Amino acid sequence: RDNPHKKICLLCVDPTRKRTGGALLGDRIRMNSLADNNLFMRSIASRGSGSEISANLDRAIEVAKAVGFDLIFCETSGIGQGSDAITKIADHSLYIMTAEFGAHSQLEKIEMLDVADLIVLNKFEKRGSEDALRAIRKQVKRNRNLFHVADEELPVVATIASQFADPGVDFLWQKLADEIGFNASEPFGQVGVRKGVIPPERVHYLAEIA
């Protein structure tokens, strides 16, 4: 809505199974139609790349550039702790994670916390997410020697992507838009707050008392 005349391309990589050689293009299944003619989405199998990206992803990006797309998003098939292949072909990189990363010491092993332009903690409504956000911020400060930077100024954003008009997602877009020169409206509301009839801490109440 902030850039109605811009053309956006989504290139989504899905993993290929070694045993069968096939790939379930799940993003294509969920997005079988797009409501805007300025949006294009293509699923790509990783095939034999041995990586979280396809061996042909860089060529797909060049084709998208050649036909005039203004912004190209590339989604990996999932990333390991020591992987950062996407940073070699993308101008800007986002690392999206949840609070289920295990012990805080596991953060030491995640390469993308060193190199990603933006780090996103999604599903922030889940229990333990606030502790996870503090741990991620501490790790980013250590990795990048940013001890003098306030927590709110770090390239770490908390989101609830499943929530309509989530302020965290709007704040993430604002940060990304600043980097790539796009327009972005001001986020409205408090980041990380789940809207709904049932408070987050009571969502699993019936299961807990059963």
Regions found by a protein language model. Name each.
Residues 110-183:
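Canonical P-loop GTPase G-domain recognition
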Residues 45, 49-56, 78, 108, ...:
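Catalytic cores of large soluble enzymes that bind and process phosphate-bearing ligands
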Residues 4-7, 72, 105, 141-148:
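Active-site phosphate-binding and catalytic loops of NTP-dependent enzymes
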Residues 182-210:
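Extended helical scaffolds that flank P-loop GTPase cores
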Residues 1-87, 92-96:
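Nucleotide-state-sensitive switch-loop elements of NTP-binding domains
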Residues 76-121, 127-135:
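Conserved P-loop NTPase nucleotide-binding/switch module
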Residues 17-19, 102-103, 165:
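Flexible, glycine-rich phosphate/dinucleotide-binding loops
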